[in-house]
């Protein structure tokens, strides 16, 4: 559900259901976040409110955003998805700069000339992930008019696109969210040329990697096993949250590895639990280390990365008061870069976390840039049962070393 925010520093207020249904959609930044003026009990009520499904006879169709730098192999991966969909009805939305649509569409035909996709909506000028969202939303609405035909929607973005604004669209547009849900962002990486990609002045390679829920390391056949290890180390320093899959020629036999990730829900937390466990067990913040003689792999100059992963430990068994302090820290951290006149000291692209409160209940934190949600979990995550793992929030972004950690009593 959307909350209209005029001042980013203000706490979002609950909106009456009837009021939401009758008011026209506003272009004002809407931040769906759980918050409370009083205590954590109000937060629980609001969480339930946020999780109420819209009146629909059909479940939301999962949308996969497929991104990656130019030439990484997105089209090859898309063809692999369509060839191995095992009866799944997949709608495809292309979003490439230039007039390559007919060419790429022809690549989606099997040897008999039969089209491998259910629906094709082409957008010109790479508008989907750039500054204009309207055309992309209209294209999705066109697909959703035939919603019953599809099991999945795949959006292939332009190679120079930032997937962040598109991902936010599924949270910001309430009417759209009732028909589709963001399932995951899949970024394809050209392992052979990743060094040049990360040196690009636009930083788009970093940004695409940082937003990913699943990273496809493509063209692994063109590099040595040692070089592949360097690539994996570099990727983990930028984004420790994403699932990593290695491919050649974009071939993927089991498409369930990248479709139906449920990366933004509260039902499947296994990958986040694994990420938190990995961050507890390994040095994922190596991009900030200063020891030039350290034993980590640095062939891709990871010491100079200003986009990286950083973890912040959270106190276990949060009380009502501590939870309110945590919310205040989250708002300040995620929203401070929105304030006019402020220098961009840091930028957060993706955030995830798991924490608990003192009554034994557990929660998952999800965020893309300044938009975040907190949702209750039905049970204690398995990883926390099997090991002594500390609750934490993981941030992916730029210059994260400038962020003050959450300290109880300092908010």
From Swiss-Prot:
Gene3D superfamilies, alphabetized: CobW-like, C-terminal domain, P-loop containing nucleotide triphosphate hydrolases
As its record notes, the protein acts as a catalyst of: GTP + H2O = GDP + phosphate + H(+)
Which Pfam family is an annotated match for this chain, by its short name? Answer: cobW
Residues binding Zn(2+) are 127, 129-130
Q: Which GO terms describe its biological process?
A: intracellular zinc ion homeostasis
Location of motif psi-PxLVp motif in this chain is 9-16
Q: Which domain of life is it from?
A: Eukaryota
Locate the motif CXCC motif.
127-130
Cited InterPro entries: CobW-likC_sf, CobW-like_C, CobW/HypB/UreG_nucleotide-bd, P-loop_NTPase, Zinc-reg_GTPase_activator
What are this entry's molecular-function GO terms?
GTP binding; GTPase activity; zinc ion binding
Q: Which UniProt keywords apply?
A: Chaperone, GTP-binding, Hydrolase, Metal-binding, Nucleotide-binding, Zinc
SMART domains attached to this UniProt entry: CobW_C (SM00833)
Q: What is its EC number?
A: 3.6.5.-
Binding sites annotated in the UniProt record for GTP: 68-75, 130-134, 218-221
> What GO CC annotations are associated with the protein?
cytoplasm
- Using the record's annotation, list all stretches that form the CobW C-terminal domain: 307-411
Q: Which PANTHER family match?
A: COBW-RELATED (PTHR13748), ZINC-REGULATED GTPASE METALLOPROTEIN ACTIVATOR 1A-RELATED (PTHR13748:SF31)
The record's function comment reads: Zinc chaperone that directly transfers zinc cofactor to target metalloproteins, thereby activating them. Catalyzes zinc insertion into the active site of methionine aminopeptidase map1, which function to cleave the initiator methionine from polypeptides during or after protein translation. Mechanistically, the N-terminal psi-PxLVp motif binds to the C6H2-type zinc finger of inactive form of map1.
Q: Which family does it belong to?
A: Belongs to the SIMIBI class G3E GTPase family. ZNG1 subfamily.
Tell me what this protein is called.
Zinc-regulated GTPase metalloprotein activator 1
Whichever gene encodes this chain, its name is: zng1
